[in-house]
């Protein structure tokens, strides 16, 4: 590969893109992977996040290999799983799903896992799994109805977005906040930098 090193984000998530931009990294392309995100029967949360992040990276790699402009790019993929014990909560698409998630999370501890998978221009794969523990306040039915009415939960793991209204539900958070948003920033940037991606090239005049 010659010329400037490029980065493809294997996601269409505005949150993941915004987090990378916050760190001064602007991907050259967004290539969301079309992957079935249904957990396998009996699959544990950690294993599910790791499997899906790798599947997204592999699917995007195949697509990028057909693109002359992007072939040989770094590919960054991630998958976030919210779990209560061993139970994996859905990425809520329906109001009923979101309501069920919120009732389950109400007044309880849960864990958020994000697996990050980086494929280098040489085809090497590096993967990290980050865990954050979160506790919600006890939610009233008014809280739940109001939040579901906001629509903020759509497509979000566990049926909530911590960077929005649901941030006011959090009593305690132990670990990476950006992990709960959808991309553990420290670990993702460390992976990129460790594999030779110029993580500081976008810092000039960033302010």
From Swiss-Prot:
Q: What is its EC number?
A: 3.6.1.9
Q: Which cofactor does it need?
A: a divalent metal cation
Per UniProt, which keywords does this protein have? Answer: Cytoplasm, Hydrolase, Nucleotide metabolism
Q: Where in the cell is it found?
A: Cytoplasm
Main location as per UniProt: cytoplasm
A GO-annotated cellular component: cytoplasm
Top-level taxon of the source organism = Bacteria
Provide the top EC class: hydrolase
Give GO MF terms, alphabetically: dTTP diphosphatase activity; UTP diphosphatase activity
Provide a GO biological process annotation. nucleotide metabolic process
Q: What's the family?
A: Belongs to the Maf family. YhdE subfamily.
This chain's function reads:
Nucleoside triphosphate pyrophosphatase that hydrolyzes dTTP and UTP. May have a dual role in cell division arrest and in preventing the incorporation of modified nucleotides into cellular nucleic acids.
**HAMAP family found in the cross-reference section:** Maf
Protein known as: dTTP/UTP pyrophosphatase
Q: Which organism is it from?
A: Nitrobacter hamburgensis (strain DSM 10229 / NCIMB 13809 / X14)
């Amino acid at each position: 590969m010659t010329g400037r090193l490029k980065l493809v984000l294997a996601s269409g998530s505005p949150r993941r893109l915004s987090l990378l931009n916050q760190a001064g990294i602007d991907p050259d392309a967004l290539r969301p992977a079309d992957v079935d995100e249904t957990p396998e029967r009996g699959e544990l949360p950690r294993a599910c996040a790791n499997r899906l992040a790798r599947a997204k990276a592999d699917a995007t790699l195949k697509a990028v290999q057909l693109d002359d402009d992007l072939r040989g790019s770094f590919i960054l993929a991630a998958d976030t799983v919210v779990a209560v014990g061993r139970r994996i909560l859905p990425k809520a698409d329906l109001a009923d799903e979101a309501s069920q998630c919120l009732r389950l999370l109400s007044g309880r501890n849960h864990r958020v896992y994000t697996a990050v998978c980086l494929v280098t221009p040489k085809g090497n794969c590096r993967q990290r799994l980050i865990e954050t523990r979160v506790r919600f306040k006890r939610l009233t039915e008014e809280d739940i109805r109001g939040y579901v009415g906001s629509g903020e939960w759509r497509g979000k793991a566990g049926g909530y977005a911590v960077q929005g209204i649901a941030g006011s539900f959090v009593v305690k958070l132990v670990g990476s906040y950006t992990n709960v948003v959808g991309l553990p920033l420290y670990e993702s940037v460390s992976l990129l930098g460790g594999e030779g991606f110029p993580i500081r090239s976008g810092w000039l005049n960033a302010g």
